[in-house]
Each structure stands twice: as C-alpha cells, then as structure tokens.
Amino acid sequence: MNFGETIERVKTRSYIARRANWDDDMFIFAQIPANINEETIPKMQSLPEVVKREITEAGFTSLSYQNQICKFDNGVITYFTPTGNEIFADDWETKSDDTLAK
C-alpha cells in the first residue's frame, strides 16, 4: 500500500506501519481530536507549569487537540514527520479493529 492510501486510513482511526523496515512495535496513528476543559488544564501532565499559567492567565478556558500525527516506538510517543523514502514507499500496512490490510 502506498503512503497516500495509508494516510487516508489514519484519518479513519487506523494505524499504519512499514513492517519491512520497522520493528513490530513501531507504528503511526492520528491522535483522536479532543477538547480539554478549564478544569483539566491545570492537571495536564503533558504541559509545563509555566505553559499552563500562560494559558489560564490569557483567559483561555479550553484547549483543542487537532490533527496530530504521532509515532509509537517501543513505548514512546512522539510527533511523526515522514521522510522522502517513507512518502514514496509502497510497503505500508494499516490496521484497524484487528484487521490488517496491505
């Protein structure tokens, strides 16, 4: 499957991977969009205290996580930016609800 086809699958909450080149525990997924309310912001572990203060002092009462493409690699989640080789590769696989597609 090519990269364009797999990105369309990511939009449907599937994950994508290149099993020929990557470890079995590495894959790409889209974070589910979320709205974070005012009560949750101070409790967020993913934001530094100074950032939480800036957000609340600026008067924001909610945060919105949108369109974040993430890479899971051996228990660590980071952002994903594809390389040229990954964009042009035809060996992508997708998985959704335990169904593998190549």
Regions inferred by a protein language model and the residue ranges of each:
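Extended non-catalytic interaction/regulatory regions in multidomain proteins
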Residues: 1-72
